[in-house]
Amino acid sequence: MSKVTVNIQYCGAWGYGKYAKALSSSIASYFGDGVVDVTFEKDSGATGNFEVTMNGTLIHSKTKDGKGRCESDKEKAGVMEQIEAYLESL
């Protein structure tokens, strides 16, 4: 059973799905199977969103914080660090 649920909300009109899938793969590779459950929420229309929540808490936001689509190692590391910190607190 997963200890963490991460939801990736992404813009459906600008092809952000590939970035959401890439982040999901990175999370699975980093934490292994069954630790993090990743879900996807595709926006209908052009929203520009790439929002990542962990158990309902926003941890990465392209729209609100001006961050990107988790393409860079730095942005991916930021997401991983927050998930890891949560897991260590359990």
Stretches with model-predicted labels:
Residues 59-90:
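Non-catalytic, surface beta->alpha helical segment in thiol-disulfide oxidoreductase systems
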Residues 55-57:
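Short strand-turn-strand beta-turns centered on an Asx-Gly dipeptide
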Residues 33-46:
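Thiol-based oxidoreductase modules, predominantly thioredoxin-like and allied folds used
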Residues 1-31, 46-49, 69, 73, ...:
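Short, thiol/selenol-centered motifs that function as redox-active sites or metal-ligating centers
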Residues 6-8, 38, 79, 83:
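Hydrophobic beta-strand residues in large extracellular and virion-surface proteins
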